């Protein structure tokens, strides 16, 4: 099982305040564990333009058709002061990792400097913090019915309204998660 470029979809019974009703995009999955970014938990009162202002980044030349009022996501409970930018190619920034053919994660300032300009990647999701699991931890949580898994979908990752991402991610595997009971069993 390789969960890289997959969604983790929180089961209804998962009540942890950070992960309740969350969708986590798995950026890295290997023998040492997993790392992902929550894609449906916007930080209150923080938008991309606020991050750029705080870092004193002025988009030049500014393309007024590109919106910078998109919310910044809480990527997870770890390193909440560190930025992670999920985007579509190109991946020629100084600190980019290609996750799939059409998804890249970048942690360097140079990608932020393209936001709001014609050099910006086509699709962008900005998050602060990340989520991580040690070796075997995520697999156990899946066995314990904390998470469903589904192959990642670009539309859900970048274009589906944030409030709909949990429900839409579950639909990828044929589940209406809103009507699902809080506890599931094993067959």
UniProtKB/Swiss-Prot annotation:
InterPro entries to which the protein is assigned, alphabetical: AlgH-like
Coiled coil: none
GO CC annotation, single: cytosol
Domain of life: Bacteria
PANTHER family registered for this protein in UniProt: UNCHARACTERIZED PROTEIN YQGE (PTHR30327), UPF0301 PROTEIN YQGE (PTHR30327:SF1)
Family from the record: Belongs to the UPF0301 (AlgH) family.
Name assigned to this protein: UPF0301 protein KPK_0728
Annotated source species: Klebsiella pneumoniae (strain 342)
């Amino acid at each position: 099982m390789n969960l890289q470029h997959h969604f983790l979809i929180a089961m209804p019974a998962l009540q942890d305040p950070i992960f309740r009703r969350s969708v986590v995009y798995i950026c890295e999955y290997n023998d040492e564990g997993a790392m992902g970014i929550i894609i449906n938990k916007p930080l209150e009162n923080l938008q991309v333009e606020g991050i750029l202002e705080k870092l004193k980044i002025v988009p030049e030349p500014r393309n007024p058709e590109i919106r910078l009022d998109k919310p910044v996501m809480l990527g997870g409970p770890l390193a909440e002061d560190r930025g992670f930018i999920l985007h579509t190619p190109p991946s020629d920034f100084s600190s980019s990792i290609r996750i799939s053919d059409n998804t890249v994660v970048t942690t360097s300032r140079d990608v932020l400097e393209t936001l709001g300009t014609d050099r910006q990647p086509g699709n962008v999701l900005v998050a602060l913090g990340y989520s991580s699991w040690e070796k075997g931890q995520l697999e156990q949580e899946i066995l314990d019915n904390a998470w469903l898994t589904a192959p990642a979908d670009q539309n859900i990752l970048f274009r589906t309204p944030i409030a709909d991402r949990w429900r839409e991610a579950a639909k990828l595997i044929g589940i209406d998660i809103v009507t699902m009971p809080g506890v599931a069993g094993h067959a």
